[in-house]
C-alpha cells in the first residue's frame, strides 16, 4: 500500500514537472510562468476551490490568500496587464481571470521558489524545505553550506510557513513548523529571534515556546534584546529567566518549607544579575569614551570580569584601535575568549569587519588565527570567503563599504600569523623530539651541554618577534603609519558594523 501511495504521489508530481502537459491554468510569479491543473488544486486546497468557483468575487468572502494574488488582475499569456480596475473590484477581476481560458494569473508577495514548494506539496503531499546543498543563497555567505540551519534555510522555511497559512494549506504549515523547531536548536540567536517574532505574529504557540526558551538561555542582557525585540517580548523573556532561576535556586530544593527564604534567594539572584547588567552598561560607556582607566578600576575594585562582559568583543566592534590595545595591555581579558552561541573570538569579529587595524593589534597580542567557532570556522575562513565573494560576485552583500585593499591586507596578516604559528608548532615538536643533552651547538668539543627546551623557547620567542615585525611592516606599507601610539587613528577606517552580526554573534 505504501509503495502504491508513493507511486501515485510521483505520478501527480510529474504532472507539475512536465509543465504544460494537460495544464488548464497558468500563474505568473516573479515574471516566470507556472502551469498547473485546476482539478488538483481545487481538490487539495479550499482556497483554490473557492477561487476557481468564483467565490473570490466577493472580497468579504474571499479566502485569506487572495490578497497574495496581486488582487488577481488577469493578464494575457504574453504578460501584458489588463486595464486596471478599482481596488474593490480586484476580486471580480480574479474570478474573470480564473474563468478565462488562456489568462495568466499574477501572484504577488510570494517568491517563485516558495510558490513551487506550495504546489509541490499540493500535488504530492510531500516537500523538502531544505535548499539544495552547496547552492549559493542570498542569506548565506558560506561556501559549501548544507543549508540545514543557516539564515537562508530559516528564511525559506518562514516564507513557506507564511504562504501555507495564507493559502490555507494547514498540513504544510504544520510540517514547516516542525522543521523550524528543529532548525532553531542549531541556528544563530539572530535567526531564533526572527522565528520568535514570526511565531508571535502568527500565533504559533509551540514554536513561540521553543524559541522564547532558547532566547532566555542565550544570556543576552535585556538592553541587547531590546534592540531586536519589542519591549513586551523582552519582559516575557525576563520572566522566563526568573522562573528558571527559581527552579534552580538551592533555597527551593533544600528549604522548601521556608517560602520567605526561597523568595529572598530568588530576589538576591535577581539583584546580582541586575548588578552585573549595570556594570556592563557602565563598562561600555567607559569604553565608548576611551576611559580604560575606569574599566581598570572596575576590574580591580568591583570584580568586573572582562571576558564575561565581552569587553574585548565590544571594543573591537565599537571603539578605536588605541582603546583595544589599552584593554589588552590590562592583562585581564583573554584575547581568544569565545562569545555567544557561535563561539566567536575578537579576531573573528575583526575579520568580519575587515578592519586591518583591529586584526593587527589582536595578532600583536597573540590572537590565535586558527581558533574555530562552534561551526568550525576560523578567522582565515571568514576572510577567504569574503575574498572569494569579491572575486566572483564583485561585491559582498551587506558589506558594500569594504575596500578590496583592506580585505587583501587583512587576509595577508591572518595568513602570515597562521604560517608563523604553524612553524612554531613544528619547531617545538622537532626540539621536543631531539635528545635532551648533546654537544654544544658551538662545537669545540669542550663537553658543553645545552638544554633543548631552552633552545625551543628562544626559537619561539624569535618567531614571535618576527611575527610582530611583519605585522608592523605590513601596516606601515598600507597606511604609511603604524606605531604603538597610533596617533591620529580613531578607528574610522572601519565601516559601520553591528555588534550583533548576521553570523550569530550576540
Swiss-Prot record:
GO biological process, one term: regulation of DNA-templated transcription
Pathway: Protein modification; protein ubiquitination
Disordered: annotated segments: 481-506
Signal peptide: none
Alphabetic keyword roster: ANK repeat, Cytoplasm, Metal-binding, Nucleus, Plant defense, Repeat, Ubl conjugation pathway, Zinc, Zinc-finger
Short name of one Pfam family: Ank_2
Primary site of residence: nucleus
Domain BTB: 23-131
Zinc finger (C2HC NPR-type) in chain: 137-151
Key word Glycoprotein present: no
GO cellular component: cytoplasm; nucleus
Gene3D superfamilies: Ankyrin repeat-containing domain, Potassium Channel Kv1.1, Chain A
Residues annotated as binding Zn(2+): 140, 145, 147, 150
ANK-type repeats, residues: 278-306, 307-337, 342-371, 375-409
The keyword Zinc appears for this protein: yes
Function: May act as a substrate-specific adapter of an E3 ubiquitin-protein ligase complex (CUL3-RBX1-BTB) which mediates the ubiquitination and subsequent proteasomal degradation of target proteins. Transcriptional co-regulator involved in the promotion of leaf and floral meristem fate and determinacy. Required for the abscission of senescent organs, probably by regulating the cell wall disorganization in abscission zones (AZs, e.g. pulvini at the base of leaves). Maybe involved in defense response against pathogens.
The family this protein is said to belong to: Belongs to the plant 'ANKYRIN-BTB/POZ' family. 'NOOT-BOP-COCH-like' (NBCL) subfamily.
Protein known as: BTB/POZ domain and ankyrin repeat-containing protein NPR5
Organism, scientific name: Oryza sativa subsp. japonica
Amino acid at each position: 500500500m505504501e509503495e502504491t501511495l508513493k507511486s501515485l504521489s510521483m505520478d501527480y508530481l510529474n504532472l507539475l514537472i512536465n509543465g504544460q502537459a494537460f495544464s488548464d491554468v497558468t500563474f505568473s510569479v516573479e515574471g516566470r510562468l507556472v502551469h498547473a491543473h485546476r482539478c488538483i488544486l481545487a481538490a487539495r486546497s479550499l482556497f483554490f476551490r473557492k477561487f476557481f468557483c468564483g467565490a473570490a468575487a466577493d472580497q468579504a468572502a474571499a479566502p485569506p490568500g487572495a490578497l497574495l494574488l496581486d488582487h488577481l488582475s488577469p493578464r494575457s499569456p504574453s504578460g501584458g496587464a489588463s486595464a486596471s480596475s478599482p481596488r474593490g473590484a480586484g476580486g471580480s477581476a480574479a474570478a474573470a481571470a480564473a474563468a478565462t481560458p488562456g489568462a495568466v494569473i499574477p501572484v504577488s508577495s510570494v517568491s517563485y521558489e516558495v510558490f513551487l514548494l506550495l504546489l509541490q506539496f499540493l500535488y504530492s503531499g510531500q516537500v523538502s524545505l531544505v535548499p539544495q546543498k552547496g547552492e549559493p543563497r542570498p542569506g548565506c555567505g558560506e561556501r559549501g553550506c548544507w543549508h540545514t540551519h543557516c539564515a537562508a534555510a530559516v528564511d525559506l522555511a518562514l516564507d513557506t510557513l507564511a504562504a501555507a497559512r495564507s493559502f490555507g494549506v494547514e498540513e504544510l504549515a504544520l510540517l514547516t513548523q516542525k522543521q523550524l523547531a528543529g532548525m532553531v536548536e542549531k541556528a544563530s540567536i539572530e535567526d531564533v529571534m526572527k522565528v520568535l517574532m514570526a511565531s508571535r505574529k502568527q500565533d504559533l504557540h509551540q514554536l513561540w515556546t521553543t524559541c522564547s526558551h532558547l532566547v532566555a538561555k542565550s544570556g543576552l542582557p535585556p538592553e541587547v534584546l531590546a534592540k531586536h525585540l519589542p519591549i513586551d517580548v523582552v519582559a516575557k523573556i525576563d520572566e522566563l529567566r526568573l522562573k528558571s532561576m527559581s527552579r534552580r535556586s538551592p533555597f527551593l530544593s533544600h528549604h522548601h518549607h521556608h517560602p520567605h527564604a526561597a523568595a529572598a534567594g530568588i530576589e538576591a539572584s535577581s539583584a546580582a544579575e541586575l548588578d552585573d547588567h549595570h556594570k556592563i552598561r557602565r563598562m561600555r560607556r567607559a569604553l565608548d569614551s576611551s576611559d580604560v582607566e575606569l574599566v581598570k578600576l572596575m576590574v580591580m575594585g568591583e570584580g568586573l570580569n572582562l571576558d564575561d562582559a565581552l569587553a574585548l568583543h565590544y571594543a573591537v566592534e565599537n571603539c578605536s584601535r588605541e582603546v583595544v590595545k589599552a584593554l589588552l595591555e590590562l592583562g585581564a581579558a583573554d584575547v581568544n575568549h569565545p562569545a555567544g552561541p557561535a563561539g566567536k573570538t575578537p579576531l573573528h569579529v575583526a575579520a568580519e569587519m575587515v578592519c586591518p587595524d583591529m586584526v593587527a593589534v589582536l595578532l600583536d597580542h597573540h590572537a590565535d588565527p586558527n581558533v574555530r567557532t562552534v561551526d568550525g570556522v576560523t578567522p582565515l575562513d571568514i576572510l577567504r570567503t569574503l575574498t572569494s565573494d569579491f572575486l566572483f560576485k564583485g561585491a559582498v552583500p551587506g558589506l558594500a563599504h569594504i575596500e578590496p585593499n583592506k580585505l587583501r591586507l587583512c587576509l595577508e596578516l591572518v595568513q602570515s600569523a597562521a604560517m608563523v604559528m604553524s612553524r612554531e608548532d613544528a619547531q617545538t615538536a622537532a626540539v621536543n623530539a631531539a635528545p635532551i643533552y648533546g654537544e654544544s651547538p658551538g662545537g669545540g668539543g669542550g663537553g658543553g651541554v645545552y638544554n633543548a627546551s631552552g633552545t625551543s623557547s628562544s626559537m619561539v620567542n624569535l618567531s614571535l618577534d618576527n611575527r610582530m615585525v611583519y605585522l608592523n611592516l605590513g601596516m606601515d606599507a598600507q597606511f604609511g603609519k603604524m606605531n604603538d601610539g597610533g596617533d591620529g587613528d580613531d578607528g574610522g577606517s572601519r565601516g559601520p558594523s553591528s555588534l550583533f552580526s548576521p553570523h550569530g554573534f550576540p
